[in-house]
Amino acid sequence: MAISNISNPMSSLIEVHMPNFAIIGSGAMGSAVAKRLIDHGATVLTYLEGRSEQTIARAKAAGMVPVGHQDLTKAELILSIVPPSEAIKVADLVADISSGMPAPPPFVDLNAIAPKTMQAVAAHFEGSGVEVLDGAIIGGPPVPGKSGPTIYISGDTAEQSRLLEDCGLRIRRLDGPLGAASALKMCYAGINKGFTGLGTAMLLAASRSGAAESLKAELSESLPDVDRKLSRSIPDMYPKAYRWVAEMQEIADFLGENDPAATIFSGMADLFARMAGDVEGSRVLVRQLDEILARPDIDR
C-alpha cells in the first residue's frame, strides 16, 4: 500500500529570532564589536551622517546597516562606543530620539569615562523611561578565533546584556551600581595605558640626554618583560594617542583633585596630546622612539 507524503507541521523549522542592535561609533572597536555580533546572526544598525569616508567604509565592511538617527530606536539595545569626549553628545542624541517612546530600548555606554561622567550621561535620560547601563571594554577589538575583549556591565539588574552574550561577546556583569564598570575601566586603563605613557616619557628623556642606548641595554638585561611590553605597546599607541588624551583626563577626574596621583594623569594627557600632534605632523618623536626600540641588545 502506498503511503502518502503528508507533511507534519511539527517538523517545520522554527524561526529563531535574532536581535537587532544599534552601535553609535564605527571606529576600530565599534566596527569590530559589530562584526562579532553580525557573525552570530544579529543585525547591527548605525548612524553615519557626517562621518569620514574611512569610518563609513569601515562600517560597511563590518556589515553594519546605515539608518537615520530615529531608526536607531528600532534596536533592542543601543550601544555607545565613541571617544570619551563624545560620550555626552551621544547620550544627548539617544535621549532625544527616545523621547516619548512607550518602551524605548536600553542604552549601554561602553566608553572610557569616569563614574562622574557616567552619572552625567545617565542624567540625560531622567524621566525618559530609558534604562541606562554602565559598561567598560577591557582589551582590544574582537578578532576571529579569540573570545575577547571582556565587556563589564554594571547596573544591569534585568540582565539586558544577556542579548550581547548570546551573540558572541564575553560579558561580565558586576554586582555594583551604575559607575562601577566605569571605575574598573579607569583603574585598568590607568595601569595599562599609564605604563605605556611612562615608558614613552622616559625613553624620550633618555634620547634627549644621550642615555638611550644604555637605557635600552639595561631594560633588556634587567627588565626584559618591561622591555618587550614597551616594544609592543609604544608603537601600538601612535595611532591611538589622540583618543587617549580625553581618557587620561577622565582618569585624573576619577582620582579627584585631592589625590596627588591625579596630576600624573593630567600630565599623561599632555604627553599623549604631544604624541598625537607629532604623529600627524613631523613624526620626530616617533622616529626617536622607533630608533630606541629597534636597538639590539648590547653585550656587556
What is each model feature region?
Residues 10-73:
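NAD(P)+-binding Rossmann beta1-loop-alpha1 motif at the extreme N-terminus of oxidoreductases
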Residues 43, 65, 106, 131, ...:
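Conserved beta-strand segments of alpha/beta enzyme cores
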Residues 1-17, 83:
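N-terminal amphipathic/basic-hydrophobic helices that include classical n-h-c signal peptides
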Residues 184-285:
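Helical "substrate-binding/catalytic lid" subdomain
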Residues 282-300:
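Short, basic/aromatic-enriched C-terminal tail that caps enzymatic domains
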